[in-house]
């Protein structure tokens, strides 16, 4: 269901006041500021209110039995996004640690640096997202509409994201893949790919901290459990991509996923997602070199960064 249609059916009191409902983000333009070398953050925060946002209302109705993961909560909380520390996108996109599936067990040690993926900006409602062009040929118009300086690193990152989406470079040829620009389009792609609307999303979460990243340190694995009870079925992974608002590259995968409880040397705790690939999955052939095994010979795993999501059947 379209979020705008959904919220139009709700009484004004549900939306947080007696006046006619307004989305959290204005339809009259999206003011962004260029915080670091290549990252966007919204300037305006949502108005103070304890009422659920339109995105939260959509989630509760579309996925009533599925808790909202932290990765999505961050995207619908512009105040938190605006206050996060500046982060270089080069760092957050390359800090990957690979390990063998057999080495993932309670008591094992792993050195990690939790960082956010590509999507640091706020998620848009479908009506707003669909009103903004999303095509390389429209990039000058997009930059003007979103107040992004032409020729900036931010603009180049957006150009790259558009090109990757248009060239369908997200995943292998036998995978369903799609770039999503709104919460509704992400939910619908995941539901269509998994063949059911009875789905849930999970993400890596650092407990008790709002920081955009954590120090690199050694973590002890306290618990490991499969995300789904039956292996071999499709899942949908959504990776954040650098853009002026939240854009995700989503694709199906047959990887095995684990929920991993971690305890850091400094007391930091995390509930992390580990995905293990048994084939020579595209784009990370170096992973096999790092762990010293032949490509595709044994499952190789990595921890999903903050902000990325995994969709599975309930």
From Swiss-Prot:
Q: What UniProt keywords apply to this chain's record, in alphabetical order? A: Signal
- Which InterPro entries does the record cross-reference, listed alphabetically? BURP, BURP_dom
Q: What is this protein called?
A: BURP domain-containing protein 8
The protein's organism comes out as: Oryza sativa subsp. japonica (Rice)
Q: Does the keyword Signal apply?
A: yes
Paired cysteines (S-S)? none
Please state the span of the N-terminal signal peptide per the UniProt entry: 1-16
> What residues does the BURP domain cover?
98-314
Q: Does the keyword Isomerase apply?
A: no
